[in-house]
């Protein structure tokens, strides 16, 4: 055994650490002809352990890049959290724990502007590719004088701008590049539970990190409890109406199909999303629905999913059957939601909350409708329902009209 690795494994683990993904597990290190390298993050290009990584060189931020304007002003609650974020960000990392549909992107516009005005580099990192393009377009509308770029699979020709929006996978390009890193939905697949992506996020940021999510995982909650992460919370959507509480129906498959088709018909004046737990069910159920009406379907395996989602958006009051690929980030105005097979072990509480949170976001249909269809009684579904009711209770505490 090489002395370097032997000393690491039996000498307290203080001799080898990947400078990019921060791995210290000796089983991932390998010695090639050029020396030691980490195999855990080798898919992002080989990094030699003995070499010193240099911070990536990016262009300076334009002086006017921080100027912004939004079509609609922030609500009182949004403005309060936005101001707190700007005030507290200098003291440490922050978790913005906001309900689905609270306007998380708009909440961080102020702190993004604050950093850009001081010539600081900012990155908005997102777990899923299809959300990157939408968020980049939205931020470009707000920051009209800034060069906002989207970096994701198929869009890597330009990787530098005043404001960078990218997938978490693309953070490997930005070693020690950002003064502010905004991690959107860090509890979402594929970022959640991936130590390589977590390491890339840590090494890309030399300043502060803001975590945006409605469903913080145990790691973030523990940091809040330990006092290493400040939590700012927002339980109110901009329109001030409650989050739709799921109606739960349990029964055999044939009865669930009856409930589904009755629901599809009764909500035909709105766009509808039917979430399912697997790709195979997605294809089978969409084929069945297509016998009575036009129906789209999309999964993570569809290479043209952006085009499918765009066609669905343009269809009038259409139906789309989807896996969890649409559970986050994608907003469909006036949409109603059904989760078929909500009791499936493929779903966790966070996924159910996120799927239910697609409904009731728009001012034109602030109440929305959410239906959970289960083969068996599900404690998970009832916990999700209880959490949404608890979030809605904050409206009552503020004396807001429900």
Predicted regions and their residues:
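Conserved interdomain linker/interface between the two RecA-like ATPase lobes of SF2 helicase motors
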Residues: 228-286, 294-295
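Conserved RecA-like helicase motor core of SF1/SF2 enzymes
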Residues: 185-188, 313-318, 324-366, 374-379
